[in-house]
Amino acid sequence: MRTALTELVGCRYPIVQTGMGYVAGARLAAATSEAGGLGIIAAATMSVREMTEAISGVRERTDAPFGVNIRSDADDAAERVEVMIREGVRVASFALAPRRELIDRLKGAGVVTIPSVGARRHAEKVAAWGVDAVIVQGGEGGGHTGPVATTLLLPQVVDAVDIPVIAAGGFFDGRGLVAALAYGACGIAMGTRFLLTSDSSVPDEVKKVYLAAADTLVTTRVDGVPHRVLRTPFVESLERSRLLRAVVNGARFKRLSGLTWAQMIREGRRMRHGRELTWAQVLQAANTPVLLRAAMVEGRADLGVMASGQVVGVLDDLPSCRELIERVMSEAETVMERLRAP
């Protein structure tokens, strides 16, 4: 299947694996790209050295194009951009709103720029900067998310910009791909569906929690930004807690990261992105990585936060990335044939 996305980045199928922190490493990104989709390394939760090693790890596994996701507000964002350019990364994506100078540098070096947005005005802004495409995530999506459903947000963005639009939030099968194409998108991006594959490095015990899950909630207790996560006793305790738990979690992250309290507070304040946050939320924003890492790396579902889209309630298997992508494309072809039938 050829779309504006496949033509732009050189992948075989219009399917993107999103850059999920502590989930999308070299193994998952390479498996996705090798299967014909576009795999994206989640470098926002990596050091520069780890990011460079992950890029090398993908290169060792596949010659297919792939992307790297970074936080453009990070102190070392410019350094990361130079690494991506030097290593010949095909696609740059952004966990949060990119800085224009980073976009200009990447585009000048021939890197395809694809930021993620959650509102039409944000899509219009980055399109005016000259980005190559946008991923637009509706409220069904996991992690940082907005209040508008994909079915309402997607057509708004498609109508508002003249660049390829990739749909995210609520997608998991071929029917969704066809629906996104009908709305005017050039492909779909999936996070939770790729998290629940055999190629994902998420611990098996955590995958079992996802497969058994039936509910998510949107909380601001993680970092002050609306965050869709699995509903767990730990998350419900975060919803009830205030400064004390933030300080306790912050102390743990301080030990792991080596940051001083002053550095943690500066990090938390930077992650506010102009919002008014309580001190508890500032500290939570600074130690968000430890909450994600606890579950996604250490396997502590009881002490961590597990970002998840609403699709988690309908997922019940762990296919390989190749099996997943081939299934989605087969389903899409079947649906399109049915629609073409008299």
What are these regions (language model features)?
Residues 96, 138, 169, 192-194:
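Short, structured patches in soluble enzyme cores that scaffold and shape functional sites
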